């Protein structure tokens, strides 16, 4: 049976649970449950702290896990990133008191508070900077105000929390993060045929859900005279579906397009004379 770790709390927990449910896996009925067995799909889910998931997967105790890329990098665990899941986006950055033009060279000799000490130490070594790293388990933003640290290194989303504590982010991100599906680096426990089949099924299903969230189905009519231009705009995955219309000189086109680009694509199609442009949500897509 495949063993998969899922965040038990935090910003990644609910979206991770939802994406697995959309992929056809059993939900837990009680938020206090730490394990859920899905016998139909041959998977057992373990609900763990997000910070611990990469360690469990890397040690070989679990086969897969969903956690943040920043947590994976900080763990130094022997895991492989299998899929980016498209939620939980953030960046990991240094931040210091507002009112000063900070650069990363200013970190030399400073006290840096963070919950991601391994990630910060690796970055400092790469930059050739000597500084003191102070490990805290949370609420690192207050450490500067309390005099525990000079600067911090933390996950930054909207930046609102930094502003509340009069801090400003600086330098390039140490890591651009989002939720990822990770797999143990050593696949020794996956030699059994049924386990391999469950693994491949999990990856394909989750990938299908993620793809469905990132793409839309676009249908439209256009003059045959601009067909070449239209298919350049909407090339689809392999190629668009094209069918003749009853109206002479017109065709109907269907293609998958990236959700993030939909408005610009519709503008381009309208500009070349396309009509009845319809974008529809899709739930799953295998490719």
UniProtKB/Swiss-Prot annotation:
Top-level taxon: Bacteria
GO molecular function: ATP binding; ATP phosphoribosyltransferase activity; magnesium ion binding
Keyword Ribonucleoprotein appears in the UniProt entry: no
GO BP, sorted A to Z: L-histidine biosynthetic process
A Pfam family per the record: HisG
Catalytic activity: 1-(5-phospho-beta-D-ribosyl)-ATP + diphosphate = 5-phospho-alpha-D-ribose 1-diphosphate + ATP
Cofactor names: Mg(2+)
Compartment(s) of residence: Cytoplasm
CDD domains in the cross-refs: PBP2_HisGL1 (cd13591)
Location, primary (coarse class): cytoplasm
PROSITE patterns: ATP_P_PHORIBOSYLTR
Alphabetical UniProt keywords: Amino-acid biosynthesis, ATP-binding, Cytoplasm, Glycosyltransferase, Histidine biosynthesis, Magnesium, Metal-binding, Nucleotide-binding, Transferase
Protein name: ATP phosphoribosyltransferase
Native species: Mycobacterium leprae (strain TN)
Gene: hisG
